[in-house]
């Protein structure tokens, strides 16, 4: 990684993308006395953590469940005085449509102890922000990795939720790195602290986007509805051209996946090669009213999470409000098939799909394949940090969970953008992480 030049004075930084990672890095930079402009193509902030209101209720379209591992998010919520509430209960709907509890055999059959020993031996830094530190050790396809280590009950206990959350099916060739990171972030593998008075999972009252709007409101320069047309990087700075005019800066932070920004970036051969290797999942959120379905819970559909052969069918749905039949449904697959397959799935469960309010498609979980991980793709991405005055945050270097992207973005800002001269102090972030201590 390149070190910043002339770090004594305030830097000017353009941040492209106003999702959680972009807003988190912008907040850190402003807190350290730097001048930041955030550019967002959409009309609102929050990225994949958007919320909408229907019938007087807030519905989250993407990320919103927080576990006891979400310490950075909890700190943000506390600092900004954002109200939280417990999440809905989790249930699995089996092939017959019966609601059952998720199997927790992994925590009781001795596999957890074997996993902890394996973790200590081969990937001890997996819980730290970022992925590069553990990528080579966990590059094998998840199914093969589970079989090689005799952790079949780990798949039984975490596979349904993993697939329902948009990360793929366990019979695909997705590397074990991502499955293990997900399992760690559930908070079930190791006891964690009670956060914000919640003994279990929690979320934001009134929609998760409330938090990101609050973050954006305290920043000095957030511009929504602005399309970046090109990024020009020079030895003396960066010029980000937009449909509203150019933005001059010392540095640019790309809070969107490299393959998404590539068409407007004056990319190097190395950047182009890495971008060409990025994969993502076509994941859909459908907000719709449906009657006759199990209520009051977050339901995982076992028949559609067990194998990639069921791709396109609904993998989960969330019924959050007792006085509303509106639910959020989640599925993979082709956009033109999602609604028709959802109608069939609801009917098969004994329900009826009523009004469809909206459908949102995400390029979810940007990641590298196993061969690329083994060959050091994430190390190569890390080596690009700061080069050509460019920094990368988001799901690709961090993993597509909001706590992971925020922690990685915060740590990047703290390590590489020291407080400007004359800045009294950063916000109180509490004790340094292990990763931060290694950098000092």
Each model region followed by its residue ranges:
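Mobile amphipathic helical/loop "lid" adjacent to a hydrophobic cofactor/ligand pocket
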Residues: 73-184
């Amino acid at each position: 990684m390149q070190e910043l030049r002339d770090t004594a004075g305030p830097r000017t930084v353009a941040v492209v993308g106003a999702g959680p990672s972009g807003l988190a890095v912008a907040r850190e930079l402003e807190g350290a006395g730097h001048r930041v402009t955030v550019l967002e193509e959409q009309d609102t902030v929050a990225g994949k953590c958007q919320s909408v209101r229907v019938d007087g209720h807030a519905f989250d379209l993407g990320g919103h469940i927080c576990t006891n591992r979400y310490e950075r998010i909890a700190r943000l919520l506390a600092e900004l005085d954002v109200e939280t509430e417990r999440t809905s209960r989790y249930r699995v709907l089996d092939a017959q449509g019966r609601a059952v509890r998720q199997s927790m055999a992994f925590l009781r059959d001795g596999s957890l102890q074997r996993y902890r020993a394996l973790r200590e031996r081969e990937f001890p830094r997996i819980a730290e922000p970022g992925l590069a530190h553990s990528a080579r050790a966990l590059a094998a396809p998840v199914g093969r990795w589970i079989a090689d280590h005799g952790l079949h009950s780990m798949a039984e206990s975490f596979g349904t939720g993993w697939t329902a959350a948009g990360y793929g099916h366990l019979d695909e060739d997705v590397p074990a790195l991502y499955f293990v990171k997900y399992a760690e972030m559930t908070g079930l593998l190791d006891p964690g602290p009670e956060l914000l008075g919640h003994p279990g999972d929690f979320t934001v009252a009134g929609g998760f986007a409330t938090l990101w709007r609050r973050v954006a409101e305290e920043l000095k320069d957030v511009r929504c509805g602005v399309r970046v047309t090109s990024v020009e990087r020079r030895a003396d700075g960066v010029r980000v051209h937009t449909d509203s005019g150019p933005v001059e800066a010392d540095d640019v932070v790309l809070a969107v996946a490299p393959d998404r920004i590539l068409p407007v970036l004056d990319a190097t051969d190395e950047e182009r090669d890495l971008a060409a290797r990025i994969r993502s999942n076509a994941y859909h959120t459908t907000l719709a009213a449906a009657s006759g379905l199990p209520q009051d819970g977050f339901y995982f559909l076992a028949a559609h999470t067990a194998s990639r052969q069921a791709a396109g069918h609904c993998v989960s749905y969330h019924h959050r409000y007792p006085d509303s039949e509106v639910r959020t449904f989640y599925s993979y697959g082709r956009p033109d098939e999602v609604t028709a397959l959802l109608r069939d799935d609801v009917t098969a469960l004994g329900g009826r799909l009523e009004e469809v309010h909206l459908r949102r498609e995400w390029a979810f979980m940007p990641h590298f394949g196993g061969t690329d991980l083994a060959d050091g793709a994430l190390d190569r991405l890390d080596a690009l940090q700061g080069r050509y005055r460019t920094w990368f945050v988001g799901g690709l270097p961090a993993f597509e969970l909001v706590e992971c992207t925020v922690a990685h973005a915060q740590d990047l800002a703290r390590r590489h953008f020291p407080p400007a001269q004359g800045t009294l102090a950063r916000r109180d972030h509490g004790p340094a992480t292990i990763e931060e201590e290694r950098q000092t």
